[in-house]
């Protein structure tokens, strides 16, 4: 393997916007991220279901006849 052609790999602390720090290996000297597993809604279980403009109600109205036919059968 040739010398001096590969970047130097070292341990760094990646810092999230929430303040969480994770130790990683990288060729970068520092890393800042906006979201991590400590603050992401998928991992924290604090997901919110947002019904914008009544999409669920519109769907139910549009397919109400279809669902009624299946219920009768």
Swiss-Prot record:
Binds 1 zinc ion per subunit. InterPro entries: Ribosomal_bL28/bL31-like_sf, Ribosomal_bL31, Ribosomal_bL31_A, Ribosomal_bL31_sf. One of its GO terms (molecular function) is structural constituent of ribosome. Zn(2+) binds at residues 16, 18, 36, 39. GO terms for biological process: translation. Its cofactor is Zn(2+). It comes from the Bacteria. The keyword RNA-binding applies. Pfam families: Ribosomal_L31 (PF01197). GO terms for cellular component: ribonucleoprotein complex; ribosome. Keywords: Metal-binding, Ribonucleoprotein, Ribosomal protein, RNA-binding, rRNA-binding, Zinc. The keyword RNA-binding applies. Part of the 50S ribosomal subunit. Belongs to the bacterial ribosomal protein bL31 family. Type A subfamily. Binds the 23S rRNA. HAMAP family: Ribosomal_bL31_1. This is Large ribosomal subunit protein bL31. It comes from Desulfotalea psychrophila (strain LSv54 / DSM 12343). The gene is rpmE.
């Amino acid at each position: 393997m040739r010398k001096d052609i590969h970047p130097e790999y070292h341990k760094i602390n990646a810092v999230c916007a929430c303040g969480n720090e994770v130790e990683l290996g990288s060729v970068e000297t520092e890393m800042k991220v906006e979201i991590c597993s400590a603050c992401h809604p998928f991992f924290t279980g604090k997901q919110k279901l947002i019904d914008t403009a009544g999409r669920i109600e519109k769907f139910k109205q549009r397919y109400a006849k279809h669902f009624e036919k299946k219920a009768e059968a």
